Amino acid sequence: GENDLKTSLEIAKRVTAAGFGVLLNFHYSDFWADPGKQIKPKTWADYGVKELEQAVYDYTLESMQTFLDAGVNITMVQVGNELSNGLLWPEGKVPNYDNIATFVNAGIRAVRKADATIPVMIHLDNGGNNALYREWFDNFTKRGEDFEIIGLSYYPFWHGSLQMLNDNMNDIAERYGKDLVIAEVSMGYTMEDYK
């Protein structure tokens, strides 16, 4: 199925009715966005940086307002998904941290306009890679709006040992003073190939 606004709203209303909170995750893409692909929505394909900034703001604010008006219990918003290599490529691809911050800041400002009490998470992959987190957040925090939570993905097959994850989490919690969330995780029973 699709996770367009209509479908996502129906799911979020059911989740709220069941007594749960909703983490609203903006991918800013027509398809799943991750470190290997951060493709701009087709309708934004020809936009420059300023137009992309405005589109992120408008889409985020309109979506937030739609969810809030429907009574959805949004308990956290994630601006972008696994942003290790940026978002809205090619304009927002690492190492262009100025544009990355421009786009993420637009999303954060829109969340704050809709409801300033909802915490914002910025999420990277590769939770065991401390150098990645330091480079990314050192660059973003020089240019970025304030946010509350750093999200990490942790898949041990790709992202290192639990000790590496632990060391990274301890370092970035102290370095940036943010709460941490493991936003994606999968722990296999075995690392052996199926025979």
Task: Describe each PLM feature range.
Residues 1-17, 21:
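N-terminal carbohydrate-binding/catalytic regions of secreted carbohydrate-active enzymes
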Residues 5-6, 34-141, 145-147, 159-169, ...:
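Active-site cleft segment of glycoside hydrolase catalytic domains centered on the general acid/base Glu
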Residues 15-33:
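Glycine-rich, aromatic-flanked loop segments that form ligand/cofactor-binding clefts
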Residues 16, 112, 174:
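Anion (oxyanion) recognition and catalysis
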Residues 18-20, 116-118, 176-179:
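A short helix->loop->beta-strand "cap" motif at the edges of active sites that frequently abuts
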Residues 22-26, 75-79, 120-122, 148-152, ...:
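Hydrophobic faces of well-ordered beta-strands that scaffold small-molecule active sites
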Residues 26-32, 80-82, 186:
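Short glycine-enriched loops at secondary-structure junctions
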Residues 154-157, 179-195:
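Substrate-binding cleft of secreted/luminal carbohydrate-active enzymes
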